[in-house]
Amino acid sequence: MPQNITTGFRALVDAAEREIETLPIEEALSLHGKEDVVFVDIRDIRELDREGRMPGAFHCPRGMLEFWIDPHSPYHKPIFAEDKRFVFFCHAGWRSALATQTAQHMGLKPVAHIAGGFGAWKKAGAPIEPPKAAKP
């Protein structure tokens, strides 16, 4: 018997976006490089290798987010205990909306995500570290 999915990903993303702060790309660009802001790249490592990286961004795979934020987790990353603003992004802004909502529910603040994600970042001509060279 097939599964009956009652809430699709789009509804989850829309609900998250009603709760969280979404930064237009122009605002994200103005925050880049500030000492009190941490950009958190939640894309998969293969995406980073394929598409490039935002200079200075902290990479936190989406699957580890809750474990890295929680100070009681054996996987906690101290960066998430710092008194900073956390700006999440993925490729298009869907996963980062959900990640930002989760971080906010966990008590991390202030948090936001970038509208359009890394795709919007690249389209705006923002700085990127190029993708790793393909292996021969």
Residue ranges and their predicted role:
Residues M1-V37, I45-R85, W94-P136:
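Rhodanese-like catalytic fold shared by cysteine-dependent sulfurtransferases
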Residues V40:
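Active-site flanking residues adjacent to catalytic metal/cofactor-binding acidic residues
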